Every structure is written in C-alpha cells, then in structure tokens.
Amino acid sequence: TAQHDLSSLRAFGSTGEPWNPTPWWWLFETVGQRRLPIINYSGGTEIAGGILSCTTIEPQVPCAFTGPVPGMAADVVDDEGRPVRGQVGELVLRQPWVGMTAGFWRDPDRYLATYWSRWPNLWVHGDWALIDTDGFWYILGRSDDTLKIAGKRLGPAEVESIAVSHPAVQEAAAIGIPDPVKGEALVVFCQLRQGIQQSPGLIEELRDRITERLGKPLRPERIHIVRELPRTRNAKIMRRVIRAAYLGHDPGDLSALENPGAVEEIAAIGRAQGMPVTREESTG
C-alpha cells in the first residue's frame, strides 16, 4: 500500500461474502491506518437494495453492521419464527419493501415456497444472521450452507474465520459431508498464500487450530489444499458447488461460475478420497 497515494480515500465499501476478522483488521489497520470506516452492506437482487449497512457516525465493530437500512423491517428469528438475540438465526423481513420481488416468471408457487413458506407474513432472505448484546448485526453466510455437526448448527464463516487467521491461509471454504454418527463431518478447503507450500504439518496445524477454537466434536474430518476456490463472477465462494463436486453429485446451475478449473480440482480430490465418506474411511 505504500506504493500508492491514498490521500483521497475516505471510506471502504464492502459487500458480498461475510467478513473474517483477520482481513477486516488488515484493511482497517494497514490500508485505513485505523481512521477510515469500513461500510459493510448486505442485501440482494431480490429486494433491489440493502437490508443491513453501517454508518460513519457510529462505532466500528469488526465484521459487523450497525443495523438495518432505513425502511427495512429486518429481524433475526429462530426455528419457530421467534425473535432471537445473541444467537444465530434466519434473517427475515417483517414488512414489505418497495423493491421486493413480487414473483417469479410463470412460477408463483416456487416464489411463495422460496420466500414466504417458512413462517406467516415473514420474508425469509436465506442468510444466517446474529444480533449481539450491543445491538450490532452480523451476516454469517447462506442458511442453505449451514453445517449441522454432532447436534450443533453453525455457519461456514465460523470455521473459515479460524482457518484464515493462520498466516499461511489466503481463503477457506467449509462444507459438511454425510457422517453416520455426527450427521455431518467437517471438511475444509484452503487456498494458501503465495509462496506457501503444502505440508502434512500445516494440515495438522490447521486441524488443531479449528479444534481448539470450536471443540473436539467439530474437529475437521479432512482439510484439503487447493489452488483456488470456485467463485461467482462477483467473487462469492460457491460452497454448494464445492460440496456437490467433492461428493460426486450434480452441481446444478454453473452459469455464474468464474473458474471451472477449481470445480474440476475439487471433484478430482473427492474421487481420490472415495466419496461419499463413511465412518470406517474417516481419517479424523
């Protein structure tokens, strides 16, 4: 960053993937010199705008949003549709919004099933979210990417944040694969920083790091080092595609995929591992 004139920089805008603390702090401290705000913003095409955002007049909290965009009746609810604080739940809207999608072309039933079928009069956006005790909001990833391991439900971002806190890891993606005992077993794919070489010692370091933070039931079954992670053209990691490729399933619609070679690499790793995994094959 020292090679560039950043004197005109006033703030950072961020949207898309959930933040991990390590890159958030790097941007805030190294590029922003601890004085420029990071404006976190999250919404969707289907509502024609944002649901959550930040302001420049309220405290900055790593990876967080200060709250809903004005006019958005956002909330976080549990499996029964009840508001929750301090725990992960579904991001919903309690009132209509002027830009909200009114239907799918020639498929009204799928529209209702996608957004309105979980609870009466609640729009389900499809993201896991959390409101902490101080009132700050967090997006934790797509709810259809949720990991359910040994009776615990967690978002992949919780695992990925730990992986990328290791100085060797550039990016990470966590998925769950079928396990007859735990329901799902944790598998993590890591893209290393330039110049870092893969080694058995590094794999064990990462596995131990995640286990120490999350507990033994969430110890990764396997950790794979890949050249790159499948992502969309706007840089979102495609965990659904990663899981399907690894298990040898049809990945579905790939029209948004930016780097097909990444999917082929993961599919080859899955074949080499003899997916789908069983308890007897476990290496954890």
Where are these regions (language model features)?
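Conserved AMP-binding/adenylate-forming
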Residues: 10-136, 143-146, 159
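Residues at the N-termini of beta-strands
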Residues: 11, 90, 170-171, 222
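AMP-binding/adenylate-forming catalytic core of the ANL superfamily
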Residues: 95-97, 102-103, 113, 121, ...
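A general structural signal for stabilizing positions within well-ordered secondary structure
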Residues: 3, 65-66, 82, 163, ...
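Cysteine/selenocysteine-centered motifs that mediate thiol-based redox chemistry or coordinate metal-sulfur cofactors
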Residues: 263-284
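Generic structural signal for residues in well-ordered beta-strands
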Residues: 38, 74, 172-174, 220-225
